[in-house]
Every structure is written in C-alpha cells, then in structure tokens.
A protein has these predicted regions:
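Beta-strand-turn-beta hairpins that frame and shape the catalytic cleft
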Residues: 1-5, 120-126, 195-199
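N-terminal active-site segment of His-dependent metallophosphoesterases
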Residues: 1-52, 56-59
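Active-site neighborhood of phospho(di)ester-bond hydrolases with catalytic His/Asp-centered motifs
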Residues: 7-8, 33-38, 64-69, 128, ...
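Active-site environment of divalent metal-dependent phosphoester hydrolases
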Residues: 11-16, 41-44, 70-75, 135, ...
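His/acidic metal-ligating clusters that form di-metal
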Residues: 27-28, 32, 102-174
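Active-site neighborhood of divalent metal-dependent phosphoester bond hydrolases
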Residues: 42-43, 49-122, 145-150
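Charged, glycine/proline-rich intrinsically disordered loops and linkers
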Residues: 82-94, 175-194
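Binuclear metal-dependent phosphoesterase catalytic core
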Residues: 179-221
Length: 221
C-alpha cells in the first residue's frame, strides 16, 4: 500500500510548500498528501499558496485539504461562522496581526475554504487538525489517556492524526477490555467488550511533516 504524507502549519508559505513537494517527489512510495489545516497565515505568498493548493501543478502530489484553526478564525471574521467573531484570534493576536491576515487572504478563496471538511476518515484512521471535539483542541504527549480515548471513540477509529499542537509524537493506548455489569430485578449480567490497540499521532508543523504506511502501520517523522 502507498504511503501518506501528512502536513500542517504551512502558514501561507508557498516556498515551504514547494520544498515539501520536492522532498516528496524523492520519497519512493509516497502517493497521497493530506494537508491538515493552518494553510493560511500573514505571509505575502499566502494567496499564491492557496491558488497552488486549489490548482496543483502537473507533477504535484494532489493535496487533500481540511480546514484548521487559522481558517476557522478567518471564516469567523468574514461572517461564515454565524455569531462567532474569532474571539480566540483576537485574544492571541494584536489588531495589526489580524489585519495582516485579512489582507493576505484574497476573498476569492473564502468559499473554497468554507467548503473544506472538518476532518477525513481513511481506512481506520481519523485525519483532523485538532480533534473530534473541536478544531482548536490541542492534543500532545501530556494529554490524559482518557481524553485521548474519548477523541478516538467519537470518530470510531483506531488511529487519530492531529496537527494542532505542532508537535510530532505517537502515543499508544494498549488494548484491553471494558467490563460492565447490568442488574435488574431478576439477575445480574456481565458484559465484556474488547478494546483494540489505538494510537494518537501528532503530525508536526511546517517543514516537520509525517510519513505513514497504512499497510505496516509504520510512521516516519
């Protein structure tokens, strides 16, 4: 089976994207490119990057894009998210940074950005920017195993690829069983449900991307 490349945090940098594409051309067996959000950023080449993602060059790996936290904030600023007005972006950035972001993303791209999915399910893998709970949900090595299991269970997947933290990691949740007792007025029943081994994988950000082989479950950072 052909490998996947999982990228996030391009931040509007066309030069970085071109370098990643060039690297992937040299990687034997890499056939699928997933861009897990945060494509945009206050970079002069942001508009050109979005055009390239929407209209790949002939030799490019076809990018499969989902929206991330940055896209969510931009769409909120433009009224695509109802009453939400990018409160988180305003809390984390000053007004000049917000204005730069607005100026570097041409409004011609807004409908395309708004059409992107929250996440993708491929085989038994969930590909998402944050988590199944929220696009801004930041999972990393310190996240409670109970939270990780919840995020996996919501999607009903065995592997969850996440980008929000910007870190590269693989956390393994070992398999086991969930036991429950159900008691009524006549008897008590014991139910056992097997839980498979599951993983949460941080794909990194920018030039730090991840390669994954679904056939062997091998990950390369």
């Amino acid at each position: 089976m052909e490998r996947w490349a999982l990228v996030s945090g391009l931040g509007g940098d066309l030069d970085l994207y071109e370098q990643i594409q060039a690297d992937l051309q040299k990687q034997r067996g890499t056939a699928h490119l997933f861009v897990l959000g945060d494509m945009i950023g206050p970079n002069p080449k942001c508009d050109a990057l979005l055009k390239r993602l929407r209209q790949p060059k002939r030799r490019d790996l076809q990018p499969h894009c989902i929206y991330g936290w940055q896209e969510e904030q931009l769409l909120s600023l433009h009224g695509y998210r109802g009453e939400a007005k990018a409160e988180e972006l305003h809390r984390q950035s000053d007004d000049s940074e917000v204005q730069r972001l607005l100026q570097t993303v041409n409004t011609d791209h807004l409908n395309w950005l708004a059409s992107l999915q929250f996440g993708l399910i491929e085989l038994d893998c969930g590909l998402i920017h944050g988590s199944s709970a929220d696009v801004g949900d930041e999972l990393d090595e310190t996240t409670s195993p109970l939270i990780l299991l919840d995020r996996l269970t919501r999607l009903d997947v065995n592997r969850l690829f996440t980008a929000r933290s910007g870190r590269q990691f693989r956390l393994q949740l070992t398999g086991g069983q969930i036991r429950s007792r159900v008691k009524d007025h006549t008897r008590e029943q014991l139910h056992e449900q097997p839980v498979p081994r599951r993983s949460v994988i941080g794909v990194g950000s920018g030039a730090d991307y991840t390669l994954y082989d679904p056939a062997s479950d091998h990950i390369e950072f």
